[in-house]
């Protein structure tokens, strides 16, 4: 079982990124996948998180106590979820200087950073062989995702 937490703030595209992630895996693999969303204060800037579980057999609940991966679209939100970590939890954050440097040099619009980080994450977990671009529109978002997959 793989437990993944996407976290960030309202307006950063966390729900959009998780929808792309779950739909692509659901329609293109033999894995079971289940997710849940939690919106904080319903406004831009409020905390948002999505818990995603992937398994080869039935999943009975999308909620978990320990994350294998935390994907932090904000750079600071992962601190809020330290209670879901273990010594083996890997945190992938947009605050990583090498990721920021690559994103800035690509001169992509700021709103594509969620798909850039999603691309980096799917590459990290070796799932970049799925037809991700079929689920991502428009072209700027595809470019950001592909750039993330190269890191």
List the predicted regions and their residue ranges.
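Active-site cofactor/cluster-binding pocket
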Residues: 1-151
């Amino acid at each position: 079982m793989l437990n993944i937490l996407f976290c960030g703030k309202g307006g950063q595209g966390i729900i959009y990124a998780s929808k792309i992630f779950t739909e692509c895996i659901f329609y293109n693999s033999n894995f079971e996948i289940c997710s849940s969303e939690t919106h904080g204060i319903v406004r831009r800037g409020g905390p948002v998180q999505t818990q995603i579980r992937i398994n080869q057999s039935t999943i009975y609940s999308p909620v978990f106590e320990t994350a294998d991966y935390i994907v932090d679209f904000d750079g600071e939100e992962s601190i809020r979820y330290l209670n879901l970590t273990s010594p083996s939890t890997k945190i992938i954050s947009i605050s990583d200087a090498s990721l920021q440097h690559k994103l800035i040099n690509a001169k992509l619009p700021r709103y594509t950073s969620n798909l850039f980080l999603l691309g980096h994450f799917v590459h990290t977990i070796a799932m970049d062989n799925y037809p991700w671009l079929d689920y991502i529109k428009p072209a700027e978002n595809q470019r950001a995702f592909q750039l993330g997959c190269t890191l």
